[in-house]
Amino acid sequence: MKNNNSGKTSLYPEEKEEKILVDPYGRKVTGLRISITDRCNLSCMYCHNEGADCCSCGSLGHEMSPELICGIVREAAKFGVRKVKFSGGEPLFRKDFEEILACLPPLKEVSATTNGILLEKRAKTLKAAGLDRVNVSLDSLNPEKYGKITGAPPGTLEKVIKGIDSAVEAGLTPVKLNMVLLKGVNDNEIDAMMEFIRPYGGKVILQLIELMNIDPQLSKYMIDSKALEKILEERASEVRVRHLHHRKKYIIDGVEVEFVRPMDNSEFCAHCSRLRVTADGKFKPCLLVHDNLVDVREAKSPKEIEKLLRLAVSRRKPYYIPATGVTKLEKWQE
């Protein structure tokens, strides 16, 4: 078991099955995805704000304190949560991010998803505070196209690339480049992105992400995911399958490529092991469901956090269910 914070020992006995959080569909919860801010310095055309309704997006007042964030993680770790991913908004907008990282219990992996703009100057301090690795959003290597997708001013792409270099140098690896595929915009850049990461020698992975079509205006940008999967398989010398969401990893000419397909994908839901936490302190059982949130800010003690955590897990339900209508995980996998 990895120990992120020197001198600390594991808080949770690995072998005690009764400690594991399991939802009504048999899925174990072993990870948290925590949004620590809604603030961001980009306005990406496809952004879903981590499923938030964003009535208070951009507001400092509603963000969780470091104490609450760490309290949530400590309680979750007692019940089998091994991995935590921090997101936003842009998590590096939190000047106290290092403070948050430093107070976490020992975990298998602590990661963050960032747009990379502020990463160059903080990569080393984030690593020292306990961050293991980062995902960096990079949808295009073309400055003009990057600006069109993200709303970023000229010169931003160069900052992101410097941030990636700094992350690799600091040991925040493997760095995963999140590339949301947009038909007719950047879907012709996959090979260029693969060549971009090749010099990093396996320390950077390309993660292709299917557009989440939650806005009718985005429908025209949806790619043919099955066709792309077929091409990737044909070109790959090796195909591996990750447990998380049953994702496929393709080794193509020595470069590692993942393809994340969340839309209309019952396999994605069947293997989902994460519980989300919104920036304003609510457990969110599913990214695409908005009426079953659990407000953890009401908790006045660790025991109350545990109670609300269990309530949120009990509300987890797969958004996409196989056409058979079978909803028990063990049946899905037969």
Swiss-Prot record:
Any one Pfam family match given in the protein's UniProt record, by short name: Radical_SAM
Residues annotated for [4Fe-4S] cluster 1 binding in this entry: C40, C44, C47
Entry binding sites for S-adenosyl-L-methionine: Y46, G89, S137
Protease as UniProt keyword: no
InterPro entries cross-referenced by the UniProt entry: Aldolase_TIM (IPR013785), Elp3/MiaA/NifB-like_rSAM (IPR006638), MoaA_arc (IPR013485), MoaA_NifB_PqqE_Fe-S-bd_CS (IPR000385), MoaA_twitch (IPR010505), MoCo_biosynth_MoaA/MoaC (IPR050105), rSAM (IPR007197)
Binding site for [4Fe-4S] cluster 2: C269, C272, C286
Comment on bound cofactor: Binds 2 [4Fe-4S] clusters. Binds 1 [4Fe-4S] cluster coordinated with 3 cysteines and an exchangeable S-adenosyl-L-methionine and 1 [4Fe-4S] cluster coordinated with 3 cysteines and the GTP-derived substrate.
Biological process according to GO: Mo-molybdopterin cofactor biosynthetic process
Reactions catalysed according to its record: GTP + AH2 + S-adenosyl-L-methionine = (8S)-3',8-cyclo-7,8-dihydroguanosine 5'-triphosphate + 5'-deoxyadenosine + L-methionine + A + H(+)
Keywords linked to the UniProt accession: 4Fe-4S, GTP-binding, Iron, Iron-sulfur, Lyase, Metal-binding, Molybdenum cofactor biosynthesis, Nucleotide-binding, S-adenosyl-L-methionine
Transmembrane segments: none
EC number of the protein: 4.1.99.22
Signal sequence, start to end: none
One of the record's GO molecular function terms: metal ion binding
Residues covered by the Radical SAM core domain: 24-256
Summary of the function given for this chain in its UniProt record: Catalyzes the cyclization of GTP to (8S)-3',8-cyclo-7,8-dihydroguanosine 5'-triphosphate.
Family: Belongs to the radical SAM superfamily. MoaA family.
Protein name from the UniProt record: Probable GTP 3',8-cyclase
Gene transcribed to yield this protein: moaA
